[in-house]
Amino acid sequence: MNYNNPTQLQAAILDWAGTVVDFGSFAPTQIFVEAFAEFDVQVSIEEARGPMGMGKWDHIRTLCDQPQVAERYRKVFGRTPTDDDVTAIYNRFMPLQIEKIAEHSALIPGALETIANLRQQGIKIGSCSGYPKQVMDKVVALAATNGYVADHVVATDEVPNGRPWPAQALANVIALGIDDVAACVKIDDTVPGILEGRRAGMWTVALICSGNALGLDYEGYRALGSDALASERKRIHALFEGSRPHYMIDTITDLPEVIADINKRLANGEMPQSS
């Protein structure tokens, strides 16, 4: 029995917020701010966006480890945040997130058409998120009412380690019956999500305008002038550079051209690990 390189993509593993739904990835960001505020600790939107893509407990832990946030917490409680404190914030975050997730559940413009295009090519649609299953169940149900149903969904608490570990992406590979990770592409708007795909041995595509890095809603994105947009693209490209995405595009609507290019590279014998 011999190994043969895959010659075309079999699966696309899509992130959720900032990739398929919730242009600008506002749902989790605003709730982090509100959850900390209930403990009388101020966290800015910009600070809350920093660790985006990680599981939500890990996200809160990372925020609490930032010196300025830890100092604000110390001024209120007389100590820096422990893991028990992180869990307390997380336990407040969860019901707030579930309560308000519907406010940011709209599909990103062009997502349905792009996903339909992938399926017409025989590409399966896997998905994963930094949300825990309790939140994902609601996100999935809301997306279904808008016409989007992924072939598989993996929440961050359904694997031993969430992003940037590769477990969620690999769980999709197993569930979808994909025979080679090199026949998969991971699409995400965060650095941890791109690292997840890289570590899983997949092709990776970073979305630079629809998600956390730009942090604007669709109308704000469309209103950017050409110079401002070029400046933001340059800034965000630099943010993603260290995670080594194979491609960087504005939104999911630009994905079909990338898929065609990956299939061409696979047909020529190129593998994601070699670039």
UniProtKB/Swiss-Prot annotation:
Classification via Gene3D superfamilies: HAD superfamily/HAD-like, Putative phosphatase, domain 2
Binding site for Mg(2+): 15, 17, 189
Record key words, sorted: Hydrolase, Magnesium, Metal-binding, Schiff base
Signal sequence segment: none
Catalytic activity: phosphonoacetaldehyde + H2O = acetaldehyde + phosphate + H(+)
Cofactors: Mg(2+)
Pfam families with a match to the protein in the record: Hydrolase
NCBIfam families (alphabetical): HAD-SF-IA-v3, phosphonatase
Quaternary structure and partners: Homodimer.
Protein's recorded name: Phosphonoacetaldehyde hydrolase
Organism: Pseudomonas fluorescens (strain Pf0-1)
Gene this chain is encoded by: phnX
